[in-house]
């Protein structure tokens, strides 16, 4: 049984022998069912308060205070439910729903709120509860609702409702007992809308919250050797949003809110069936037929045949079961609907509005893509985590409950048959004609022709059940939000602007670009590549694509000469690596294709960012040297070759400007690049190593400067060229030696991407190499961001849901169920504490003591004492639910009686079972109403429901049920053609009408027939309470 709060049952003082049932009194007010505590950790089961002497019961032969004097005490209200202990331990099995009255379908209650959104976009809104189907058939006995323990059985009038004995919390239902299948989730048949009066159609449920998206898997860690780590597993899908609680059936007791379908939280407790809906009264009798024309004199009009009584409307379909309740939350059982009074006759019931259709729950949003794996030690980016599993779509809203059928107008009672009309006096004989023929006899007064008896107004057929609410349209699946575009990586391009610093590029000319190939050694700066880890920023590297602007970057290339490498230190830009988070946008990075743009060369590193798109893996594509294309630019690098004038390499200091080539700074991002592990991707840079260019690299020092030279051609850098004079910075070019850091040159490996450029080898080497450093940034970036995603890995938290597995504990409870046997002792329950002793066990047999057994609840401690106490687990004894079955036994009888109501009181006796309840083992006792005998004690768990058997006193409510029953009878009965014929009777007045007399018969008969229906009366529902 899903975890649900248990209702706290107060212990009841020993119950004296049951007195003879008192005369039925008006049904005692049914105690309110204790509110269900919020699910909390199941608190320790507080001692169960002793059950006070049972209050006088309601009509059901009120149980005597102690039963000794036989005076039924007033039925005590059900004690407040203790707060639900944390942990939402499953409540004791709810009372077994009594067979719901065939009432109108309850309106669907509003949908429960959707679960909170989880960190990863927690559960989506619960799917709307579908409208409840058309009025349910006479509800079968509701499955044992997985309601929390029924509120204390007021029947025994909790002695001063023993407050909740220590809040039993959800009876601190041990763990979530595994759903012992507390009677199976059958209880899930949601709350069976008691078919009480047809409630107004509930609003259609709100669309359920879409299930949470699964968290994206964590990115795999890169392998030690730099192999991309395995991608993180996809995050578990977020739990689906809980479906909104099922709407309450109309006036029928509100069903517990169906919890969202959670991990299969307990289903809301079954709402008590509402009182039988009023049977739609027959429609008003048909108009009386106009009196027939006088027939031939003397002929009496034949009495009209009574109109057929309207057939009762078809029984509505059974309401759909409510969706499974949220875990732990059992909906409070709805109060039993009051049986509808018989509608005044003659008024046709309006047809109830059709229930709104539930909306379909939104689709769960797609899980976030897994973060890119962290780069391995070799710097290779780990594989991106798998995208989180897409959250489950919210359930499709259930069909809205059928609009309540309008009560059929009560059938108008047939007016009493009109007095038979005096036969029209025969006209005086006509004067004899001249021929002496007697004048024609005066025509008899026209017999008022009995109009055809007014057809009994068709019994107001119940309106056809209101059409089922159209099935809620499925709400459009919440459109999956398109993944936010990966935020564009902060345009590193801006850095590219730095490229304009490139003007230093002219100095770049200095760098013979070919030497740039040396830049390949710059790959050393590739160490910056380490910065490359900043590369995560590189995710922004996508922006790096803008880095294409980077081409000015090439001016940066000037700087690129290892200068950039220092910039790699600039890796602070790696902070941009933070931008890298935008790299999430990096998904675009998937556009990794863009990474291609990265090919634009420096941006190519951005291309790495494109890798970002890959979420790392793509980053690898970035390695693809999207920069490679940049490599093509590399040919421009060849221009760098022009740079071979590299001697201007002195301008290399301008290369420092190359530093300006913030792109290099991007390299700084590289600093961020710790992620730069990707920088290792730069290994691709190794390709750069391929960098035959590497050899150039030697030239590199100059070349480095020179490389920018290529950009220098852009000439814009030319101005920067002035910085060229900085050529002393060319010394910085030595920094280019830092380029030697080029080990990061591995970054240069990223240059490999450049390698793609290899075709442009000259450029490839040079520019790409340069790009490579940026690439470092880029690649890094991708990982960085994704690494962040790694956070989602948290989703694993859902694992917490695992506790639900705790419910599995219920199974444990099951064993306590056996303890329930001890529950017999539970009967001894008062001693229940002693319950372990079970000494009173024999008394438990006494049953009445069994009530004492309620103390047996204290017996729960007994449960503890006895395994029964374990019975708390016994609560889990939900297995005891089986006990509920027992309950049904107990409740059943009371239930039926429940209709009688008073017998329901006997249901109170059910309490003996209650003792079963007591020992939660006692609850088993319930089963044991037999459990009173204790043996059933196990079932006694169920017995708690047995307490509900006490609730059977609610059977009084059952009495209410009877009214419902009458409703049906009355309704049709009235219709019993009487009314119909009545009108004809009047017509009959013309003597001939007298014949109409026949109508009378039909009238009464009509009535009688309908009563048959009463059988369905919900009172058993009351017994449900009892249950």
From Swiss-Prot:
- The residues that carry sugar chains are 96, 108, 192, 261, 279, 573, 612, 657, 738, 765, 810, 927, 936
Where 5-hydroxylysine occurs, the residues are 96, 108, 183, 192, 261, 279, 342, 351, 546, 567, 573, 612, 657, 738, 765, 810, 927, 933, 936, 939
Q: Which residues cross the membrane?
A: none
* Record's compositionally biased regions (Basic and acidic residues): 63-72, 380-396, 437-446, 575-599, 750-771
Per UniProt, the ranges with Gly residues bias are 73-91, 259-268, 502-511, 802-814, 973-982
Role, per record: Fibril-forming collagen.
Q: Which PANTHER family match?
A: COLLAGEN ALPHA, COLLAGEN TRIPLE HELIX REPEAT
Outline the subunit composition. Homotetramer.
The entry's protein name is Fibril-forming collagen alpha chain
Question: In which organism is this protein found?
Answer: Riftia pachyptila (Vent tube worm)
């Amino acid at each position: 049984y899903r975890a649900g709060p248990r209702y706290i049952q107060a212990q009841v003082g020993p119950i004296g022998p049951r007195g003879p049932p008192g005369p039925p009194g008006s049904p005692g007010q049914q105690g309110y069912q204790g509110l269900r505590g919020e699910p909390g950790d199941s608190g320790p089961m507080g001692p169960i308060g002793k059950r006070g002497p049972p209050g006088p019961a309601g009509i059901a032969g009120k149980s005597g205070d102690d039963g000794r004097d036989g005076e039924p005490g007033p039925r005590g209200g059900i004690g407040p439910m203790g707060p639900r202990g944390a942990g939402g331990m499953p409540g004791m099995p709810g009372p077994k729903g009594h067979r719901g009255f065939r009432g109108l379908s309850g309106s669907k209650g509003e949908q429960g709120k959707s679960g909170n959104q989880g960190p990863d976009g927690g559960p989506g809104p619960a799917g709307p509860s579908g409208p409840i189907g058309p009025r349910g058939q006479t509800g079968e006995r509701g499955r044992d609702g997985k309601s929390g323990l029924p509120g204390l059985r007021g029947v025994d009038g909790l002695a001063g409702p023993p407050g909740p004995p220590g809040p039993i919390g959800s009876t601190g239902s041990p763990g979530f007992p595994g759903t012992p299948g507390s009677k199976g989730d059958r209880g899930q048949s949601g709350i069976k809308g008691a078919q009480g009066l047809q409630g107004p159609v509930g609003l259609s449920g709100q669309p359920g919250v879409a299930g949470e998206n699964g968290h994206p898997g964590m990115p795999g860690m890169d392998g030690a050797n730099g192999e991309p780590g395995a991608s993180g597993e996809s995050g578990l899908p977020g739990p689906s949003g809980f479906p909104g609680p099922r709407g309450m059936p109309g006036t029928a007791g509100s069903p517990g809110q169906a919890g969202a379908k959670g991990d299969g939280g307990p289903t809301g407790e079954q709402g008590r069936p509402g009182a039988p809906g009023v049977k739609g009264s027959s429609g008003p009798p048909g108009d009386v037929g106009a009196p027939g024309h006088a027939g031939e004199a003397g002929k009496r009009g034949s009495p009209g045949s009574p109109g057929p009584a309207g057939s009762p409307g078809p029984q509505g379909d059974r309401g759909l079961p409510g969706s499974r309740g949220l875990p732990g939350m059992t909906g409070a059982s709805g109060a039993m609907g009051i049986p509808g009074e018989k509608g005044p006759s003659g008024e046709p019931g309006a047809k109830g509005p059709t229930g709104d259709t539930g909306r379909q729950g939104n689709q769960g949003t797609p899980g976030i893509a897994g973060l890119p794996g962290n780069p391995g030690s070799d710097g290779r980016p780990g594989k991106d985590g798998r995208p989180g599993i897409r959250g489950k779509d919210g359930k499709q809203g259930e069909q809205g409950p059928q609009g309540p059928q309008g009560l059929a107008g009560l059938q108008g009672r047939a007016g009493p048959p009109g007095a038979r009309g005096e036969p029209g006096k025969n006209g005086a004989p006509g004067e004899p004609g001249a021929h002496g023929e007697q004048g024609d006899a005066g025509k008899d007064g026209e017999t008022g022709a009995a109009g055809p008896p007014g057809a009994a107004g068709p019994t107001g057929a119940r309106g056809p059940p209101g059409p089922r609410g159209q099935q809620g349209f499925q709400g459009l699946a919440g459109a999956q939000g398109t993944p936010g575009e990966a935020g564009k990586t902060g345009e590193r391009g801006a850095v590219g602007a730095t490229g304009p610093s490139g003007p230093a590029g002219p100095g770049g000319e200095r760098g013979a670009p070919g030497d740039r190939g040396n830049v390949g050694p710059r790959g050393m700066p590739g160490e910056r590549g380490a910065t490359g880890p900043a590369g995560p920023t590189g995710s922004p590297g996508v922006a790096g694509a803008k880095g294409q602007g980077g081409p000015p970057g090439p001016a940066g290339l000037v700087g690129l000469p290892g200068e950039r490498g220092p910039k790699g230190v600039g890796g602070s830009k790696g902070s941009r690596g933070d931008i890298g988070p935008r790299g999430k946008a990096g998904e675009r990075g998937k556009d990794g294709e863009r990474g291609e743009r990265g090919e634009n060369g420096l941006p190519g590193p951005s291309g790495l960012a494109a890798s970002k798109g890959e979420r790392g893996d793509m980053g690898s594509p970035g390695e693809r040297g999207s920069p490679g294309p940049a490599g093509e630019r590399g040919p421009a690098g060849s221009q760098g070759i022009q740079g071979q004038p590299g001697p201007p390499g002195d301008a290399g200091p301008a290369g420092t400007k190359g530093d300006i080539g913030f792109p290099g700074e991007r390299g700084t991002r590289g600093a961020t690049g710790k992620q730069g592990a990707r920088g290792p991707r730069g290994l691709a840079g190794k390709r750069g190593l391929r960098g035959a260019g590497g050899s150039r690299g030697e030239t590199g020092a100059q070349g480095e400067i020179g490389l920018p030279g290529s950009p220098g051609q852009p000439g814009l850098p030319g101005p920067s060229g002035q910085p060229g004079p900085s050529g002393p910075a060319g010394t910085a070019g030595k920094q280019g030696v830092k380029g030697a850091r080029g080990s990061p040159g591995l970054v240069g490996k990223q240059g490999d991407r450049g390698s793609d450029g290899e075709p442009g080898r000259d450029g490839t080497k040079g520019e790409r190499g340069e790009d490579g450093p940026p690439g470092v940034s880029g690649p890094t970036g991708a990982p960085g961001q994704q690494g962040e995603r790694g956070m989602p890995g948290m989703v694993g938290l859902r694992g917490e849901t695992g506790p639900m597995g705790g419910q599995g504990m219920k199974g444990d409870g099951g064993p306590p169920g056996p303890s329930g046997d001890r529950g017999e002792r539970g009967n001894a329950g008062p001693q229940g504490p002693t319950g372990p002793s079970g000494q009173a066990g024999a008394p438990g047999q006494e049953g009445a003591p069994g009530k004492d057994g309620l103390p047996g609840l204290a017996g729960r401690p007994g449960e503890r004492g006895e395994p029964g106490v374990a019975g708390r687990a016994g609560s889990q004894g939900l297995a005891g639910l089986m006990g509920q079955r027992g309950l049904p036994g107990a409740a059943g009888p009371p239930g039926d009686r429940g209709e009688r109501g008073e017998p329901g009181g006997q249901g109170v006796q059910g309490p003996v079972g209650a003792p079963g309840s007591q020992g939660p083992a006692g609850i088993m006792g319930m089963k044991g109403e037999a459990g009173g005998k204790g043996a059933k004690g196990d079932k006694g768990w169920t017995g708690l429901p047995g307490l509900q058997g006490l609730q059977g006193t609610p059977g009084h409510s059952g009495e209410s049920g009877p009214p419902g029953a009458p409703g049906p009878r009355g309704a049709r009965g009235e219709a019993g053609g009487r009314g119909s014929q009545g009108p004809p009777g009047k017509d009959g007045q013309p003597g001939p009408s007298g014949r109409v007399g026949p109508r009378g018969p039909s009238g009464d008969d009509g009535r009688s027939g309908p009563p048959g229906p009463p059988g369905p009366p919900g009172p058993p529902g009351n017994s449900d309470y009892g249950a």
